[in-house]
């Protein structure tokens, strides 16, 4: 075989090799998704194919992700109403949101291991089943003396979330072409964001702030029944429709990943390799800072708005809706832009900086007593802060290829949950003592730190390198001047 062919067509991400920018990669073990694109012992490129069903899969995932994320914020956005109904304090209702964050931290590692061992379908089934179970537990909790039951339902849904958050990048890699992965990941994140948006909008409408507790219980029960019906329908769809992977892989990198024996994969070794990846660790920190700020703002939004605009529970929900809808637009635009430009670091840094500017403007305009100004500044904040989510996922996959997408996404989300809990508790205490401006400036300081760290991340796009070298190999393999023996 032509020696040029051997040299060019070997993408050994497991060896100590040079990355795009010359940095030495010290990955010395193979992982389950190790794409060693080695064409030494065959003369034809593996077949790749894109199936129309890929859009069904990502949209179905997006739908049950929506149903789960909606429940994350459904208590917090009408914080004052649930406080009165269940007879608990504000901090206790804040924990209905923070339980989503806390549950994620210890469970992400076993769930990531399960994803690598059992695949997408098993994870999807467990997520949809737990989400469905949690909604029906809540149906039974619509009485003032049953707060522990409603907390149990929320806890069950929070466990389901662990099986959801790390999936977008994995679904994108397994089902979509190399020019579609960022867009597909954005669609996966889109569902989560849309669920949060609906969680901001619908509860204040379905559960008005009425004085009669029996009437209030009836409104809460209707909200819980609607959620349970949707969750049950989606669970049935997942059972019937959701498929593990396409029969023929969508990319050469994915085809190479399938040739790696499962027995050669070590989850512990994969985690250790990721922890030695300096660029990825910096991204984990910056992602946690940004998304943690978003979690804190979302959880405490009702308190911020009610402090300056008493009686505006419905508009507090609409402002939250504005934040997330603007973010969904930002996510899709960023995903499409990444697929076309491949400028992962530059785009991530620009969006991070704009998130910081958006939060500063929001902080200083919140108390102007003009709600229309808050809607505009909140929309600008959401466009960039929520739009950052898929950027972090896709940048992580590039930096950590060929490691499992579920593992890298899981570590990002784990960081976000840790910072989310810390920021929510700290900002809440600062707001109680010094007001909303001080609380928001507290978050701005950490976004500034995150922006600086993002600028220090080295752009080592390993997945792009693997696909480029595989395509080069294909070109040489089909060249009429190629000599075969």
Swiss-Prot record:
It catalyses: choline(out) = choline(in); ethanolamine(in) = ethanolamine(out); heme b(in) = heme b(out). GO terms for cellular component: endoplasmic reticulum membrane; mitochondrial membrane; plasma membrane. It is found in: Cell membrane; Mitochondrion membrane; Endoplasmic reticulum membrane. This is Choline/ethanolamine transporter flvcr2b. InterPro entries: FLVCR1-2_SLC49-like, MFS, MFS_dom, MFS_trans_sf. Keywords: Cell membrane, Endoplasmic reticulum, Membrane, Mitochondrion, Transmembrane, Transmembrane helix, Transport. One of its GO terms (biological process) is transport across blood-brain barrier. The gene is flvcr2b. The lineage of its organism: Eukaryota, Metazoa, Chordata, Craniata, Vertebrata. It comes from Danio rerio.
